[in-house]
């Protein structure tokens, strides 16, 4: 049997109710997350249905396996508001994430940096080298010659 820690966010307008998000973390994660290695990965991706975005954060076990810290489906595009909801949920259930020894690797997209600075100010945000290179190629147009 698997137990989930779950929050459902409803956006309520007069006369109707609209599901705007679902955030999950498995119950055993409360005991496991404090013992994971101190490097976590976080990312978001657009979903194939509706205008929802999938948010996720994973840690690494001692055996180098990925372990799900938290996951969420939130209505709308990836933005600071969505990351704020996600990180507040993750921090509520895993307060050990807000520690100066924690490094969170992200892709520096759409509000994640500002959200981490506001909600997990002690954690260190490090940018993924793959995405860093993609940004250099796209925005600076560098990296196309031998010594650029």
Give residue spans per PLM region:
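DNA-binding interface regions
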Residues: 1-148
